[in-house]
Amino acid sequence: MSFTSRTCIGRVEASTGIARYELDQWLKAIGDAGYKRVAVQSLHVIPGEEYLSLMNTDVKKYFMIQWYPHIDVLKGTNLLSSAEDTKDVAEILYKHYESKLAGKNNIVLLMGHGNPDENYNANKKYSDMEKALQELAANNNIFVGTVDYGDMLFFPKEIEEEPANRIPVEGFDKTQYPDCMYSKVMSYCEKNGLNPSEVNVYLAPFMSIAGDHAHNDLWGLEAMAEDDDVSNVEINTNEYSWRERLEKLGFKVDRTFESHPTDQAGADHGIKDGCNCLLYTSDAADDL
């Protein structure tokens, strides 16, 4: 296993003492070892900047064309590669949260990573996932936001850049920012005649590796293990996590930490379905 994020590589080494090779080192070692066929399976959720860099630069340009054109390569897609993928993952996630979604006084919020560069159009996958989930949930009480894409942050991008307004001032117009998480949860309350204090919120990351974002941006807490009660965990210095914002708004946030619902629900990136790989043979190198 390798990571496209150097942050992940550094954190894994810091926490385990095990140094992980960067991707180019792995690919060179595999090629030098004499393998004839190599499968590269992405763990990315959306086809954003890092996924495209992985497949188009690291795998295609360097490994397949420059370094080892004689090796056949199977390229695995990201989790939400097609509309059918979105539908399948939504069904599995809905079953995972079905009991919580049965009551109007409960809402589930999923935090995706997001892609800051809109040129890739990958963030639409999160909107598609939310739509698919809400078609299954009779109460339309499950929402998807991101930690790194302006329109789908907890508050809109221009407000995120003003620390004094992290909790919106009176007069915030939700209709101007319908895709931010604040607008979604407050509009849900208004539509259903509920005060935030009457609503239970269940938080979970929608990422393949969610350590730092789950702990800091979602929960604002020190490191936790699966199913830990966050009431017993020390708050860290992150003052603007989703959890804290929701609690300041009056919502009741469930205190059970969940780090990886896609894995627990059995929907982990299509790997269980045989990698969903596309095969590129050495004979077809000119067509890549």
Give residue ranges: language-model regions.
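Hydrophobic, ordered structural segments
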Residues: 27-84, 90, 94-96, 115, ...
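Short, structured motif recognition centered on aromatic/hydrophobic residues
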Residues: 38-43, 108-111, 201-209, 279
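A short beta-strand-loop structural module common to alpha/beta enzyme folds
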Residues: 1-7, 145-148
